[in-house]
Amino acid sequence: MAGLINFEDEQEVKQFLDNLGVEYSYQCYREKDPEGCHRLADYLEGVKKNYESTAQVLQHNCEVNAHAQSCYKLGAYHVTGKGGMKKCLKTAYSCFLKSCNTQGKKSVDACHNVGLLAQDGRALETGPDTTVARQYFEKACEGGFAPSCFNLSTLYIQGFPGLDKSMPLALKYALKACDLGHVWGCANASRMYKLGDGTDKDEQRAEELKNRAKDLHGQEKERQLKFGE
């Protein structure tokens, strides 16, 4: 059938991929399309394995177009120093913050990373900041990012300067993490109901959450097995 690529023909595939690169470059630099720029970055990274060029496109698309997904990936490049980018957690923090506040693809993940870096403190001049960490974990949790809900729960279990210990809030976020499929959110919530920590004791609810944790753990193991096949 005309128009279909014969993926068994190495030369035809190479020509097809080269044409994609030209098309994405045109979208990015001639049409000024931020999505085209991100497609170009994905192409350079995934097809060409040219991480230096990828980093340059990501930087352009983040700084000029404030593209959330490109800012997120640029932040990840700065965390590891990939593609010739300076390995710098402060710069990574700025990229993640920009992505988080832009509210596009990967913005929720970026908000979570802002929370992690604020909690760790190495990206901030003033050191660890639990207040900022909580703020961005809350933003990511509201966006349905389970690890942020779980992290909020652990923050309230422990208590930190500027964040009072609160077992009812710890339970609230553990339950939300559980609802979003986080194994340890379910496990922690189960234990709280079993002990009556932050809530009245409820053996039945504790058992339900324990079984939910077991089911999620089993699903994770099954996914890992399938991935390894």
From Swiss-Prot:
Gene3D superfamilies, sorted: Tetratricopeptide repeat domain (1.25.40.10)
Cellular location(s): Mitochondrion intermembrane space
A GO term from the CC aspect: mitochondrial intermembrane space
InterPro entries: HcpB-like (IPR040239), Sel1-like (IPR006597), TPR-like_helical_dom_sf (IPR011990)
UniProt key word Cell division: no
Pfam families: Sel1
Name of the protein this chain belongs to: Cytochrome c oxidase assembly factor 7
First and last residues of every Sel1-like repeat: 34-66, 68-104, 108-145, 146-182, 183-218
Protein's organism: Danio rerio
Disulfide-bonded cysteines: none
